[in-house]
Amino acid sequence: MKKTLFSVMWLAIAGVFTITALSACSDDDNENKSGSYVIQKNGVVEPSQQVDMGVFNIDGKKYRLIFAKTNLTARGLAKAESDFGDFFSWAAPEPWCTAYERTATSLTPTAWISGKADGYTLANAQYYDGTRYTKYQNENEQLLPEDDAAHNLLGGDWQIPSRAVWQALVDANNKSVTWGKDGEMKLTFIDATGKPGMKISSKSNPENYIFLPATGRIIEKEFLSVGLHGCYLSSTLATPYNIWAVGFGEGSGGVFTACRRMTGCAIRPVRLVAE
């Protein structure tokens, strides 16, 4: 059988990224889906969109980590590996930004869901009542399935990776996987779009890899470090106000607690298969 685990982090790097045109936040090809939290189900994700990264020790047990090939969007998975997908706040059921403008040096949000026009703020944060968070208050507490956007959108046992999952993937660098060429954690390009990111490859089967675009993150209405830094949610709470997340930049990466619950970050779904 399979067991559910979760986690979160980020790494601050300032910078700009040269891109052009108007874009929707979601580049996706799947319809909105939801379903019961059923173990041993692939949900709505096709086999071609799943990547077997090998077996890892997660909290003392061995699991095969099956990652989605692309980032999560409001309606499923992004079309291309280099697509940013959508930016989710922790425990939120949907992204608040629905479109952004790409300029020569930045991304600028241009559309929001109803009630979230102020952006990724504390006041808008899921389960914040104006004075405190009313749900999830304990260190290392995990998101429940009903608050996991990856599970709710993809179904099956898909989930946001836990802190333990991300940490296992980081610790495996130059052992069972490589982060960037030769494990040096250098950013690279995966296609002609010119969007940089981190390529994490299985050492035993280099054709099995995931590419994490350097999405940056969004705080309030400002995108930060786009093209220089990747910030991906975990399902694990660090403090009542902060979460664990995985972050990377040119030559560095790890799991950190500097990500606030209301920050908008990318999600790379995973499912765990017990060995």
Residue ranges, per PLM feature:
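C-terminal, surface-exposed recognition/capping segments
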Residues: 27-41, 55, 69-79, 83-94, ...
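Structural boundary micro-motifs
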Residues: 2, 32-63
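C-terminal motif of bacterial Sec signal peptides marking the signal peptidase cleavage site
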Residues: 20-24
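A short glycine-rich, aromatic-capped structural motif
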Residues: 49-133
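Bacterial N-terminal signal peptides that target proteins for export
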Residues: 1-12
